[in-house]
Amino acid sequence: MIFYVVFYAAAFFLFYHLIDRIVKKNKKSEQGKQGQQNRQNTVIKKSAPRTVRYTTPGNGIWPLFEDALRQHHLLIAGKTGSGKSVVENGIIDTLLHRLPFDKLGNAQMILIDPKGNELYKYAKLPHTLVYAYQPEEMLKALQYAMDLTAERFQVLRETGDDYYNGSDVYVFIDEFADLMTTQGKTVKPLIQRLCQLGRAARVHVVICTQTPIAKVIPTEIKCNFDSRFGLRTRSAQDSRNIIGKTGLELLPEYGEGYYMTPKEESYYKIPYVTKDEIRETIAWWEDQMQQNGLNPRKAA
C-alpha cells in the first residue's frame, strides 16, 4: 500500500514538474515573440542621419529633400508644431536650388494653400504655374493639374512611351484636411485621379496633414502615397495611421522624423531652412525674373 502511495506521489510530482516547464517555456517563447513584434512595430532610431548640405550659389541642397523630390507622391504628417512646414519649405527650397537657370522648365509647381499663409511667398516665382487659396481657385488649380496630366497622357499614347519625357510638376497641398473639409466631395475624385495617373505623367502630389485618418484622406487616395515623412504625433494610433507602426508619438516635439519610401525607412534629424534663407532664395529668383524677362505664374 505504501509503495503505491509513494509511486503515485512521485508520478504526480514528475507530471506537475513537466507541465510547469512546458508552460514556462511557452510563456517565455510568447514573450519573445511579443518583444520581437513590438520592436518591429516601433520606430527604431538610426544613427548618422543625413544632414550634409550640398552647396550651390546662395544656399544649397539637402540630400534628404532631394530624395523626397524623386518620389512619385509624398505625404507629410504630424501634429501641430511638429515641423510639417519646415519639411515642406525645405523641399521647395531644394527644388529652387537644384535647377540651373537655363533648365528652369525641368520642375514647376502648382501651389494649393487653403489657409493662404504658408505658400503665398512662392506665388510669383517663375516655377509656379498656379497659386490658389480661395475655394474656387483651389478647385481650378486641381482641374488645371488634371488637364495637364491628361495632355501628357495624350503624348504618351502618341509616342508609345511608358513615362512622359519632360518636366516634373509638383502639386503642393498645404493643410489637406482644410481642403477636404470645405470641398471634399468635389476635389476627392480629382485628387484620386491625379494620384493614379500622375506617376506616368511626372506629376507629383505632395500633401501636408496632421493625421491621415480615413475621414481626412480616403483610402483610395492614401494608398498612392507610399513615400512619407512621419513627424511627432499625439498618439500611437496616429503614428500607425502615418507609417504603419508606433513610435512617432515618442519623437521630440520638433526637429526629428521618420522618412519612409519603397526603398528605405530611416530616422532623421530634419534639416532646417531658415526664413532668411528662403527670403534670399526668393529674392534671387525675383531678380532673375527682372533681368531675364521671365514670365510670372500662370493664372488658374
Regions found by a protein language model. Give the residues of each.
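P-loop NTPase catalytic phosphate-binding loop
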Residues: 2, 6, 12-157, 166-170, ...
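Short, cationic low-complexity segments
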Residues: 290-297
